[in-house]
């Protein structure tokens, strides 16, 4: 019984761990399927299809966050790649309804990027460099960096107030552990 229980818990846990390969190494992400099941399901689905592989970090604001996930215009491996449009696209799937929680936007938090409409998240996400309490309960938190945050800190920073990156770093691959 104990062995079966351990196997079940380990399998359940491993299904919520993803590996994001960056140029400097691997980052482990723990997904919060209990807090944001629809956002986690979307993230996993796009990752399993390889749609995040090659996607750039198009918006990176030092001391705030690194944003990626535009699978339409931000995929450097795609014929549709257009850095000037990166950040305006998403997947072909419908937008997601918000799944706000009381989890604070602390350092390492993985959260869904969206427009001014709280129900407009699709494929884009951001990772916080430090606490951003002004985002709490306004953006859907769906995971956290549990290993390799120092690699997120190394992502090339953008310029100006919007944090646009001219020669951006990219996600090499994103897969379940």
Predicted feature residues:
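Cleavable N-terminal signal peptides
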Residues: 1-2, 12
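Cyclophilin-like peptidyl-prolyl cis-trans isomerases
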Residues: 8-177
């Amino acid at each position: 019984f104990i062995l079966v229980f351990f196997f079940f818990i380990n399998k359940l846990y491993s299904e919520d761990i993803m590996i994001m390969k960056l140029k400097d190494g691997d980052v482990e992400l723990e997904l919060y399927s209990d807090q944001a099941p629809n956002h986690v399901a979307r993230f996993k689905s796009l990752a399993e299809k390889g749609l995040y592989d090659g996607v750039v970090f198009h918006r990176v604001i030092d001391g705030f966050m690194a944003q990626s996930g535009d699978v339409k215009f931000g995929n450097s491996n795609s014929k549709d790649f257009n850095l000037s449009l990166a950040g305006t696209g998403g997947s072909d799937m419908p937008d997601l309804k918000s799944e706000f929680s009381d989890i604070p936007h602390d350092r390492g938090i993985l959260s869904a990027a969206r427009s001014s409409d709280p129900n407009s998240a699709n494929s884009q996400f951001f990772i916080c460099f430090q606490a951003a309490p002004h985002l709490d309960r306004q953006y859907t938190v769906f995971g956290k960096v549990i290993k390799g945050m120092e690699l997120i800190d190394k992502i090339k920073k953008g310029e100006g107030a919007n944090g646009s990156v001219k020669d951006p770093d990219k996600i090499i691959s994103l897969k379940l552990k």
